[in-house]
Every structure is written in structure tokens, then in C-alpha cells.
């Protein structure tokens, strides 16, 4: 081990036990603080009876260890009028109330939407919400929202001061609901309402594995989603948003899906997530201790 402090090298005295104990305790506390500021996990598949996930309504894990968001019959067929959600158990610290720091995050997942017809419904979403979030209505609301905040035309679709609708989502919408959707299937970003504030047309492929990556940059305050099928051009949609003004300090992340009279199988095949608050500049006294470690 090389120590950079010249005076310390010249004394050639070992660190005293009290100082070593202090440094050890300091590093342990530092680790604990950092661990609450960041979170990462990876599911290459979804083992049965996973204790890391919260299942709501019809969500389940299949015998093939895929995450099925909506109800599937014993014969493998999707059911009508189904709502299901799955959330990661450990909450994510999205921002720090005491410092105003905002987290960056990135999530990547692969999925397949499979329908017995070419008219599926209704879609699924990756979403961020308060830790005590509960399922919303099915059909076009994707299990995310209740009918009262379907649309707020006076504020571009955002439900103003609606504490029960603290949700940011990236939706993969397969069914066109005329009252709140563009006239095509789309990937959209929703903020407190099922009416997407940003969206792009999406060519759904029946039963084909797709990949999505969603990221948030706190410096630019930009939320970006990139979606692709094999051998196709990736689709990108982004939105400028200060998540600190929309969501609480602690949140949960997960998936939500629904069917109506039209049906589909919403399968999440793999999922990874990582988040971290912006690192603060080290204090002068911390730098002094670090010289001796």
C-alpha cells in the first residue's frame, strides 16, 4: 500500500487503535449512507415465489419464469378484463429532501406482447409511483390511473395537484382509445394522466421479443425511452421533466398492464434497474481522513 503523505512516511509510526477504529466506523457509516442513495438489481428471469417483487391483482410468474402482468388461462390464453402489476419490493430514493439532489436512473427490460388476433389490447407500462401505490382501472387506463384523472385539457393532460395520481410512466399502447390516444399504436410518456405528453408511433410485432431502455438524466432533467425489435430501427421518445416536482422522495418502480374486450399476453422476460443520487463534493475533513486509508 502506498501512502502519499510524506510526513507520515517519515515518522514510520503505525496508526493507533483508536484512529483505526474511528476510520473503520466512518467507512461503515459512509457505506450505509451511500447504499441508501443507490439501488441496482437484475432479473435474467423470474424465479417462482420471488420475495423481491410485489404482485398486485392478476400479475404472476409463469412456469417458464417470465413475469406475466395480466391473467393467463391454464391453456395459455390471455383473459379479458384483466389488470395486473408487479413492483420491486425495495423503494428507490428518487431525490434527497435535505439537499435537493435528484437521482439518475436507467432500466432495461425485454418483453413480448402476444395476442391470438391482430387486434390486441390494451398494453403495458413501466411506471414510477409512491411506495403505497395501488392498481387503477383496466382497459385503456392500463391499471395505472382512475377515471377521474383521465384527462386535463387545461394543462396538457397533467392532473394538477392530484396527489392520488403521482405517477410517471412509459406506456406501450397497443389499443387506440380515441379519447386519450393518438390515432396509432404508440410508446408514450405519461405524467399523472393516461394522456401521453410525448409519444411516437410504434409498430407492434405479435409475439416478438423487444427491448426497451428508459433513463433519466437529472442534469438535463430529461426522461428518455428507446425501444427496438430485432432488425428494426430503434424508436426514441423523450420528455423534459423535473421529477422532484411530480413524485415523492421515495418511490417504487414496476410494471402495469391491462386487457379489455381485446386481449394480449404481456410478458416481461428480463429486467435490470440502477439508480444513484448525484455525488456530493467531499468535505475537507473527509479528505483529510482519506489520506490515511
Curated annotation (Swiss-Prot):
CDD domains: lectin_legume_LecRK_Arcelin_ConA (cd06899). Keywords: Calcium, Glycoprotein, Lectin, Manganese, Mannose-binding, Metal-binding, Signal. Homotetramer of four 32 kDa monomers which are post-translationally cleaved into a two subunits: A and B. Mannose/glucose binding bark lectin. The lineage of its organism: Eukaryota, Viridiplantae, Streptophyta, Embryophyta, Tracheophyta. Ca(2+) binds at residues 173, 175, 177, 181. PROSITE patterns: LECTIN_LEGUME_ALPHA, LECTIN_LEGUME_BETA. Glycans are attached at residues 64, 152, 162. Residues 1-35 form the signal peptide. One of its GO terms (molecular function) is metal ion binding. The keyword Flavoprotein does not apply. It comes from Cladrastis kentukea. Binds one manganese (or another transition metal) ion and one calcium ion. The metal ions are essential for the saccharide-binding and cell-agglutinating activities. Belongs to the leguminous lectin family. It comes from the Eukaryota. This is Agglutinin-1. PANTHER family: CONCANAVALIN A-LIKE LECTIN FAMILY PROTEIN (PTHR32401), LEGUME LECTIN DOMAIN-CONTAINING PROTEIN (PTHR32401:SF47). Pfam families: Lectin_legB. Mn(2+) binds at residues 171, 173, 181, 186.
Amino acid at each position: 500500500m502506498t501512502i502519499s503523505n510524506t510526513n507520515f512516511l517519515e515518522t514510520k509510526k503505525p496508526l493507533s487503535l483508536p484512529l483505526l477504529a474511528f476510520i473503520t466506523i466512518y467507512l461503515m457509516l459512509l457505506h450505509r449512507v451511500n447504499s441508501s442513495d443507490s439501488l441496482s438489481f437484475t432479473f435474467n428471469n423470474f424465479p417462482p415465489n420471488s420475495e423481491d417483487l410485489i404482485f398486485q391483482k392478476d400479475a404472476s410468474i409463469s412456469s417458464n419464469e417470465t413475469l406475466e402482468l395480466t391473467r393467463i388461462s391454464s391453456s395459455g390464453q390471455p383473459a379479458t378484463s384483466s389488470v395486473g402489476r408487479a413492483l420491486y419490493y425495495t423503494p428507490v430514493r428518487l431525490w434527497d429532501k435535505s439537499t435537493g439532489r435528484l437521482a439518475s436512473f436507467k432500466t432495461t427490460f425485454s418483453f413480448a406482447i402476444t395476442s391470438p388476433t391482430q387486434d390486441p389490447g390494451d398494453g403495458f407500462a413501466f411506471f414510477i409511483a409512491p411506495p403505497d401505490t395501488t392498481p387503477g382501472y383496466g382497459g385503456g387506463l392500463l391499471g395505472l390511473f382512475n377515471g377521474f384523472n383521465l384527462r386535463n385539457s387545461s394543462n396538457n393532460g397533467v392532473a394538477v395537484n392530484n396527489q392520488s395520481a403521482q405517477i410517471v410512466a412509459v406506456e406501450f399502447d397497443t389499443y387506440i382509445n380515441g379519447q386519450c390516444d393518438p390515432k396509432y399504436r404508440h410508446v408514450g410518456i405519461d405524467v399523472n394522466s393516461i394522456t401521453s405528453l410525448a409519444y411516437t408511433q410504434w409498430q407492434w410485432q405479435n409475439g416478438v421479443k423487444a427491448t426497451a431502455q428508459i433513463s433519466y438524466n437529472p442534469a438535463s432533467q430529461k426522461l428518455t425511452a428507446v425501444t427496438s425489435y430485432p432488425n428494426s430501427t430503434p424508436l426514441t421518445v423523450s420528455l423534459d421533466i423535473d421529477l422532484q416536482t411530480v413524485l415523492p422522495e421515495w418511490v417504487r418502480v414496476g410494471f402495469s398492464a391491462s386487457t379489455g374486450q381485446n386481449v394480449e399476453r404481456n410478458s416481461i422476460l428480463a429486467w435490470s434497474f440502477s439508480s444513484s443520487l448525484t455525488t456530493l463534493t467531499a468535505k475537507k475533513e473527509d479528505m483529510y481522513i482519506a489520506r490515511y486509508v
